[in-house]
From Swiss-Prot:
The gene is pufM. Belongs to the reaction center PufL/M/PsbA/D family. This is Reaction center protein M chain. The lineage of its organism: Bacteria, Pseudomonadati, Pseudomonadota, Alphaproteobacteria, Hyphomicrobiales. It comes from Blastochloris viridis (Rhodopseudomonas viridis). Residues 77-110, 167-197, 285-324 are periplasmic. It is found in: Cellular chromatophore membrane. It is a multi-pass membrane protein. Gene3D superfamilies: Photosystem II protein D1-like (1.20.85.10). Residues 2-51, 138-142, 224-259 are cytoplasmic.
Length: 324
C-alpha cells in the first residue's frame, strides 16, 4: 500500500471533476481538464479548465501588444539579426524618453514606443486585476489575492508613471529589459544618494525577508505534523487536534510563542502586502521630498558623516561636451 510522503507528493488523486456553487448557482464546468503526471509530483495533477472571460482576453491582448512592442524594439537595436538578438538579448532594452522631453510626448523612436508599451502593460495588469477580483467574488472567496496584486500593480505604476510625473520627466522611468532595468536601479540609487539609506527601502527588504522566513517556518511545520493530519489546516483552525498542539508546543519550546493555524496566513498576507507598499512609499518620497537619502540620514543622526579624504568627483553629465 502506498504511503503519503511529506517531501514530495507520491499519491496523485484523480477523480470526476466536482462542480462548485458559484455566483449563479450550480453550473457545469466549461472545458475538459487533463492531467500531468510530472506536475502531480509537486502539486495537483489536474490542468484546467481555464476561464478567461472578457477581462482575461483583454489582459492577454494588451499584454501581448506590450510584449511585441518591446521585442520589436529590441530586435531593431540589432537590425533584426536573429543571431545577435539571442546573443545580446540580456543587454537589449526599450528606454524611456530623454530628459529634454519632460512630460511631453516624444517621437516613437525616441521614447514614444516606451510610453506605448507602458500604457498597454498597465491596461493588461488592470484587466487581469479585474479578472482576479471577479473570479474570487464569483466563487465566494475573499478578495485577499486581488488586493495583494493591486499593491504590486501600484508599485509598478510608482516606478514607471507616478514618480516620473511627480519629478516632471519621463526619463526617470524604468526601461524594459533584463540588464537595462538593473542598470536603472543602480543609477537611481546613486542619483538620490544611495537608496539603501532610505528607511522605506529597508522596511520593504525586511518584510521580504520576513515573508521568506514565515513561509519556510510554516511550510516546514505543516510538513512535520502532516503524519498527524496537520495538512488539513482548515479543520485544525476551529478544532485543534494533536498535530496543531504538537506544532504549537514545538514553537513555544523554541521561541516561547506560537502562531495559530489561521494567524500565520494572515501574517504572510500582511508581510507580502507591505513589501510592495513600503517600496512604493520609498519611491514616491525619492526626488520629491528627499533628494539625497544619505544626507537625509546624516541630518537625522541615522548615518555617520564621513570625512572627505579625496576631492569631490563632478557628475560626468555636468561636464562640458557631455551629451544633453
Amino acid at each position: 500500500m502506498a504511503d503519503y510522503q511529506t517531501i514530495y507528493t507520491q499519491i496523485q488523486a484523480r477523480g470526476p471533476h466536482i462542480t462548485v456553487s458559484g455566483e449563479w448557482g450550480d453550473n457545469d464546468r466549461v472545458g475538459k481538464p487533463f492531467y500531468s503526471y510530472w506536475l502531480g509530483k509537486i502539486g495537483d495533477a489536474q490542468i484546467g479548465p481555464i476561464y478567461l472571460g472578457a477581462s482575461g482576453i483583454a489582459a492577454f491582448a494588451f499584454g501581448s501588444t506590450a510584449i511585441l512592442i518591446i521585442l520589436f524594439n529590441m530586435a531593431a537595436e540589432v537590425h533584426f539579426d536573429p543571431l545577435q538578438f539571442f546573443r545580446q538579448f540580456f543587454w537589449l532594452g526599450l528606454y524611456p524618453p530623454k530628459a529634454q522631453y519632460g512630460m511631453g510626448i516624444p517621437p516613437l523612436h525616441d521614447g514614444g514606443w516606451w510610453l506605448m508599451a507602458g500604457l498597454f502593460m498597465t491596461l493588461s495588469l488592470g484587466s487581469w486585476w479585474i479578472r482576479v477580483y471577479s473570479r474570487a467574488r464569483a466563487l465566494g472567496l475573499g478578495t485577499h489575492i486581488a488586493w495583494n496584486f493591486a499593491a504590486a500593480i501600484f508599485f509598478v505604476l510608482c516606478i514607471g508613471c507616478i514618480h516620473p510625473t511627480l519629478v516632471g520627466s519621463w526619463s526617470e522611468g524604468v526601461p524594459f529589459g533584463i540588464w537595462p532595468h538593473i542598470d536603472w536601479l543602480t543609477a537611481f540609487s546613486i542619483r538620490y544618494g544611495n537608496f539603501y539609506y532610505c528607511p522605506w527601502h529597508g522596511f520593504s527588504i525586511g518584510f521580504a525577508y520576513g515573508c521568506g522566513l514565515l513561509f519556510a517556518a510554516h511550510g516546514a511545520t505543516i510538513l512535520a505534523v502532516a503524519r498527524f493530519g496537520g495538512d488539513r489546516e482548515i479543520e485544525q483552525i476551529t478544532d485543534r487536534g494533536t498535530a496543531v498542539e504538537r506544532a504549537a508546543l514545538f514553537w513555544r519550546w523554541t521561541i516561547g510563542f506560537n502562531a495559530t493555524i489561521e494567524s500565520v496566513h494572515r501574517w504572510g498576507w500582511f508581510f507580502s502586502l507591505m513589501v510592495m507598499v513600503s517600496a512604493s512609499v520609498g519611491i514616491l518620497l525619492t526626488g520629491t521630498f528627499v533628494d539625497n537619502w544619505y544626507l537625509w540620514c546624516v541630518k537625522h543622526g541615522a548615518a555617520p558623516d564621513y570625512p572627505a579624504y579625496l576631492p569631490a568627483t563632478p557628475d560626468p553629465a555636468s561636464l562640458p561636451g557631455a551629451p544633453k
